[in-house]
Amino acid sequence: MKTKRTELRIGLPSKGRLFDGSLDFLAKAGLSVYKPNPRQYEATIPALPGVLVLFQRVGDIVVSVEEGSVDFGITGWDTYRERTYNSSRSMPLLKNLGFGSCTLQVIVPESIREVRTLSDLAVYRNNLARPLRAATKFPNLTRRFLDENGLTDTKIIEAEGTLEVAPAIGYADFIIDLVSTGTTLRDNHLRMLEDGEMLRSEACLIANRAALKERPEVMALARTLLEFMEAHLRASTTVSVFANIRGESPETIADLIFEQDVIGGLQGPTISPVINREEGDWFAAHIIVQRKDLYAAIRELRSIGGSGVVVTPVTYIFEEEPVSYKNLLEQLEE
């Protein structure tokens, strides 16, 4: 009789950009991974006692979560979509972790200058009087995308390793591959089609659906992970701003702040009196603003008499309940 597993397991990428990105992301979310031996494929998260970290290839993480040998995993959204085609044994908990960004693109040689769009590619096929050949690591996503765009007779060549050389050696007419900066494409005389984007991808958090339903400890860990990850992601785009403002009362300061476009804060400013040696009433205002709006916020504070502006990073912003956890509960009821 097989012993029921009680250990909680999280799969993380074993190498590459997603390996570094996952460790950095978890550390910033307060869930640092402890891996004393770099050669080992196991680790722990001190903040989560009883949780075992397993380092795997991104594709194997999806398979392990699907099969239930691992409860949670961080992998690429592109890999997850490809490996779970027509499957519902796993589910995404957070689709955008903020790192590992790339797009899945239809890519053609620069030498076929007349091909700029998918429609052009269909005309090119007709002129060749034969089906086109597409090399890719994503046969399921590729098949569906090409079928939806009138290229149903394209021969899909499933390949591993470097795809950029395939058109040059006559192995394929075009490729479908992940693109982050586009530098590799230019170096190999390739370019993306204008309408050839198949998928936008980032690192994502996934979980085994049955484990969430049947094991309370897995559901409890899901909530903890989502609490810290979502709070970190929400905070990562914001800064905390303090400023001293002269005024008659907290209410008058608040009125001045609410007349501005940027500095209203999350629910509103926190305003408190400043004990100072100078004459007149001073108040300290504390607000949270989007990082991209920081300079606009400073200008607005100055316009209402603000001075001594101090800006600090925000580590977490916790809401009453994580939105992603509410979504998880709803999905499990479906």
Where are these regions (language model features)?
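Small-molecule-sensing regulatory modules
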Residues: M1-F55, I74-T103, I112-S119, Y124-E334
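Acidic/His-rich segments in extracytoplasmic proteins that coordinate ligands and/or metal ions
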Residues: D60
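Aromatic- and charge-enriched surface segment that lines or borders ligand/interaction sites
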Residues: G68-S69, W77
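Periplasmic solute-binding protein
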Residues: V106
